[in-house]
From Swiss-Prot:
UniProt organism field: Streptococcus gordonii (strain Challis / ATCC 35105 / BCRC 15272 / CH1 / DL1 / V288)
Name of the featured protein: Glutamate--tRNA ligase
Gene3D superfamilies documented for this protein: 1.10.10.350, HUPs
Catalyzed reaction equations: tRNA(Glu) + L-glutamate + ATP = L-glutamyl-tRNA(Glu) + AMP + diphosphate
GO cellular component term of the entry, any: cytosol
Gene Ontology MF, one: tRNA binding
Name of the gene: gltX
């Protein structure tokens, strides 16, 4: 009988949801939903120094915003936070101590640092040397008594089989193996404060929750042999492992770093800017996985149906902000107007632009928006001073036929009554200028667009002129004529 599919996303509540962690959650979610399995959220909060108040809520809230749901979590199940499972960890610590597979270590941080310094100076690979090495039982007992009398609190270390080979078939990477002698010696499984270390607790949790597959970033590859040692020591079967490739900056080719200020890296940032969650979901799903074919826009249901762990990439995934913006624009263009207008209203209100023209402005600029917050800079023309022209725009306006076009079009606008000044009547006036002057194409439309809006590209020109208003459009044209004549 096939083993039930149970996967987990296990964040530490140490801050906002990073794009890399969101990808880990999303791939586990897709894997579970595709195979009809169980998706679990577990909170790994044993690192008390880095614990952030509200970090757990932020993680779950942003996962929900992306469109993920889960079957088990701290919200519905007891003891799904590591801090609630200390008794369980202690049970297995005691078992390993009793079986002689682990021992209490009284070496101090200062002694460890001094030994590490000595090893580095000698050109040796830093590793822990068993402090009891060469001691008789009497010497060992005396050493422990002396240390305890000095008030030194011990850690607990797992005894490492130096000659052991720890290998697994990775879902993504293929066969991987480590030699026990290259792990760095016996390692700490319980800290002085009584909390377990990550590599110990995660094994207890995964076994207790019957996790079948562990899908995570390849920065965890070095953790896997240590975890396999714990499985071996406790006589448990390990789950299958899959390690996704790193996410790199598409511009630098280096690992995505918090110093990459040209890239938004936290899901909260995308929420605040008004990206649509389904666009971000779609984009993240393609970071290191490809369903095949040329299509790139997929609904959540389509991604669940198409997901195939065998198509997870062995090469680093390039985070391309421009591609995300293109994808986001596609989603916004195709979204219901009412939804986009509702999302745009808070940005317009904050900017003092929630006027009677707001609905029409959102309709006008919806096809251009990469994120909904762009509605504010896109509508600057209607609420701010005329923008300064770029070099390319000044070059267009230096054309010898530009004054002829602008004078003719200004005259057309001045001749229109308020009743005649509606969107559908503006384009015929531009065509009339073409007929009168013989000027057409870019030489006709571009000077009018730049004179009115200050930009070479934008929404339909008649819509822009109508929303700007007849008087303001005439004023902009007059100002431009004064500049170029």
């Amino acid at each position: 009988m096939a083993k039930a599919i149970r996967v987990r996303y296990a964040p530490s509540p140490t801050g906002l949801l990073h794009i890399g962690n969101a990808r880990t959650a999303l791939f586990n979610y897709l894997y579970a939903r595709h195979h009809g399995g169980t998706f679990i959220i577990r909170i790994e909060d044993t690192d008390r120094k880095r614990h952030v108040e509200d970090g757990e809520r932020s993680q779950l809230e942003n996962l929900r915003w992306l469109g993920m749901d889960w079957d088990e979590s701290p919200e519905t199940h007891e003891n799904y936070r590591q801090s609630e499972r200390l008794e369980l960890y202690q049970k297995y610590i005691d078992q390993l101590l009793a079986e002689g597979k682990a021992y209490k270590s009284y070496v101090t941080e200062e002694e460890l640092a001094a030994e590490r310094e000595r090893q580095e100076a000698a050109g040796e690979t830093p590793r822990y040397i068993n402090e009891y090495l060469g001691m008789s039982e009497e010497e060992k007992a005396a050493y422990i008594a002396e240390r305890e009398a000095a008030g030194i609190i011990p850690t607990v270390r797992l005894s490492v089989n130096e000659s052991g080979i720890y290998k697994w078939h990775d879902i993504v990477k293929g066969d991987i193996e480590f030699e026990g002698g290259n792990i760095g010696g016996d390692w700490v499984i319980q800290k002085k404060d009584g909390y377990p270390t990550y590599n110990f607790a995660v094994v207890i949790d995964d076994h207790d929750m019957q996790i079948s597959h562990v899908i995570r970033g390849d920065d965890h590859i070095a953790n896997t042999p240590k975890q396999l040692m714990v499985y071996e020591a406790l006589g448990w079967e390990a789950p299958e492992f899959g390690h996704m490739t790193l996410i790199i900056n598409s511009e630098t080719g280096k690992k995505l770093s918090k110093r990459d200020t040209n890239t938004l890296q936290f899901i909260e940032d995308y929420r605040k800017k008004g990206y649509l969650p389904e666009a971000v979901f779609n984009f993240i799903a393609l970071l290191g996985w490809n369903p095949g074919g040329e299509d790139e826009i997929f609904s959540r249901e389509e991604l669940i149906k198409l997901f195939d762990e065998n198509r997870l990439s062995k090469s680093p995934a390039a985070f391309d902000q421009k591609k995300l913006d293109w994808m986001s624009n596609e989603y916004i263009k195709n979204a219901d107007f009412e939804r986009i207008f509702a999302l745009a209203k808070p940005y317009l209100e904050e900017a003092g632009r929630l006027t009677d023209k707001a609905e029409k402005l959102v309709e006008l600029y919806k096809p251009q928006m990469k994120s909904v917050d762009e509605i504010v800079p896109l509508t600057d023309l209607f609420f701010s001073d005329f923008p300064e022209l770029t070099e390319a725009e000044r070059e267009v306006m230096a054309g010898e036929t530009v004054p002829v076009v602008l004078e003719a079009f200004k005259a057309k606008l001045e001749a229109m009554t308020d009743e005649e000044f509606v969107t559908e009547n503006i384009f015929p006036q531009i065509k009339a200028v073409q007929k009168e002057t013989g000027i057409k194409g870019k030489n006709l439309f571009m000077p009018i667009r730049i004179a009115v809006s200050g930009e070479m590209h934008g929404p339909e020109l008649p819509d822009t002129i109508y929303l700007l208003g007849r008087e303001k459009s005439i004023q902009h044209i007059e100002n431009m004529l004064n500049q170029i004549q």
